């Protein structure tokens, strides 16, 4: 039987024994809400809690999921199992109540692994590009009629959601390396987009331990599984012999199994040609900009082709791809004096990701001045990538810096926003402006000019400012 015929089989997923009701602590998080939605659609009773109301919690409530705002031991009264995100402290009253009641308390990745247990799981890992790659692969397989279940770390703009329960044997999901929880997954196939020095505290500040974790992740596949890795990434390429599983590589270099050539940017679209062994060249148009997104698309194309997705479905998926929330997302053009300001919001929070955003913005809108409002994410990342941040942020025309979004970390001396601004100023390419979020309006009014593009950049709450701008020109 061909692979393309396999997904036509509808599957029956065994129920989790004795588990009827699931409670998610931190249900509004990007990684948690999708699993909660899928479990609800599978017929389980689902509840959740979060510290504040958000569009995500409101949407979950509209699906019939009971969401409590605030954490309280009473919230788990009807639960048979409690799922927690890595951001939740062990002293949380709901966790303590669950332990006292002898309920299982499991990590998000454990529940994702349970979803994957009886399915043909495809996991997407890597330092950068996971969400976009997962989304593109989901679109390709959906266009081909595979009807996969998917759990993505960002909202698919086309569907307005980041998870869906399909009827086929396929499950496509992001695999999170930040807390090493991706090691709990046992997929049938996996993509690694790249490897970089991020979340190093998890790995004892050892790059060798980080690389070993990726190898273990890929070795969690069965011996007949497939590893799709970026052959342009030297660290990944050097690891191939240690994987011990079938491997296909993708990239821009000719040694790869799947290669992109003739890459051209045309506004917000990217055109390129895909070369694959024993196939005719495939001319494609990707409906988002950036060479980094060509690599993301190649990763998805490589996996989709191996799974039996036809070229027409790949073409349609790339041409209609509307992007992912907070990934170079164009919010609006807002009026400014006798012109406008283009608002772009991006989640990237690592120097490599910020550099990719800047490159894509320059290529797409070369006539616009690039103003970036950057919010550093975590003191540890600012410390570990300090010199790279200084170099990358110096490439913009106007730089506004918000305080570090701590994500629960204690401040680190020399890794704060003022130190970062001082080093950028000494480099001499751009004059950074440190600004308090509550005093942003007058600074924006003074700095922004007609014809600018303003990029709100970071993984914290900076994206909310872009939404406010798009809604009512708050700072213009």
Curated annotation (Swiss-Prot):
Biochemical pathway: Cell wall biogenesis; peptidoglycan biosynthesis
Protein name listed in UniProt: UDP-N-acetylmuramate--L-alanine ligase
EC numbers, comma separated: 6.3.2.8
Key words of the record: ATP-binding, Cell cycle, Cell division, Cell shape, Cell wall biogenesis/degradation, Cytoplasm, Ligase, Nucleotide-binding, Peptidoglycan synthesis
Taxonomy, superkingdom: Bacteria
GO cellular component, one term: cytoplasm
Catalytic activity: UDP-N-acetyl-alpha-D-muramate + L-alanine + ATP = UDP-N-acetyl-alpha-D-muramoyl-L-alanine + ADP + phosphate + H(+)
Family, per entry: Belongs to the MurCDEF family.
Record gene name: murC
Repeat recorded as keyword: no
GO biological process entries: cell division; cell wall organization; peptidoglycan biosynthetic process; regulation of cell shape
Disulfide bonds, paired cysteine numbers: none
Keyword Cytoplasm attributed: yes
Function of the protein: Cell wall formation.
GO molecular function annotations of the record: ATP binding; UDP-N-acetylmuramate-L-alanine ligase activity
């Amino acid at each position: 039987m061909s692979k393309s015929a396999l997904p036509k089989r509808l599957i029956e997923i065994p129920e989790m024994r004795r588990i009827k009701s699931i409670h998610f602590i931190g249900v509004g998080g990007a990684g948690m809400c999708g699993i909660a939605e899928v479990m609800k659609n599978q017929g389980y009773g689902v509840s959740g809690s979060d510290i504040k109301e958000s569009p995500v919690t409101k949407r979950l409530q509209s699906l019939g999921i009971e969401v409590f705002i605030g954490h309280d031991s009473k919230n788990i009264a009807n639960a048979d199992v409690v799922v927690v995100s890595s951001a939740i402290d062990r002293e949380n009253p709901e966790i303590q109540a669950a332990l006292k009641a002898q309920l299982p308390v499991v990590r998000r990745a454990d529940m994702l692994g349970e979803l994957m247990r009886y399915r043909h799981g495809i996991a997407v890992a890597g330092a950068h590009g996971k969400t976009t790659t997962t989304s593109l692969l989901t679109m390709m397989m959906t266009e081909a009629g595979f009807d996969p279940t998917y759990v993505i770390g960002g909202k698919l703009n086309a569907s307005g959601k980041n998870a869906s329960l399909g009827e086929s044997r396929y499950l496509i999901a992001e695999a999170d390396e930040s807390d090493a929880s991706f090691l709990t997954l046992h997929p049938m196939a996996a993509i690694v987009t790249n490897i970089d020095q991020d979340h190093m505290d998890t790995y004892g500040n050892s790059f060798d331990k980080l690389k070993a974790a990726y190898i273990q992740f890929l070795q969690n596949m069965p011996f007949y599984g497939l590893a799709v890795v970026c052959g342009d990434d030297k660290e990944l390429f050097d690891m191939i012999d240690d994987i011990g599983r079938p491997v296909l590589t993708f990239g821009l270099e000719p040694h790869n199994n799947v290669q992109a050539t003739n890459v051209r940017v045309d506004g917000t679209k990217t055109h390129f040609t895909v070369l694959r062994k024993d196939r005719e060249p495939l001319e494609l148009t990707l409906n988002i900009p950036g060479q980094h997104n060509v690599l993301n698309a190649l990763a998805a194309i490589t996996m989709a082709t191996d799974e039996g997705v036809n070229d027409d479905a790949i073409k349609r998926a790339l041409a209609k791809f509307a992007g992912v929330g907070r990934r170079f997302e164009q919010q609006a053009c807002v009026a400014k004096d006798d012109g406008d300001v283009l608002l772009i919001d991006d989640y990237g929070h690592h120097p490599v990701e910020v550099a990719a955003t800047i490159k894509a913005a320059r290529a797409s809108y070369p006539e616009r001045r690039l103003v970036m409002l950057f919010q550093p994410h975590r003191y540890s990342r600012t410390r570990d990538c300090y010199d790279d941040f200084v170099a990358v942020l110096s490439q913009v025309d106007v730089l506004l810096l918000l305080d570090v979004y701590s994500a629960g970390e204690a401040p680190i001396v020399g890794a704060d926003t003022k130190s970062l601004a001082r080093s950028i100023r000494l480099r001499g390419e751009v004059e950074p402006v440190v600004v308090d979020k509550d005093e942003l309006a007058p600074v924006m009014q003074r700095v922004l000019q007609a014809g600018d593009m303003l990029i709100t950049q970071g993984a914290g709450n900076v994206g909310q400012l872009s939404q406010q701008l798009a809604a009512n020109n708050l700072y213009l």
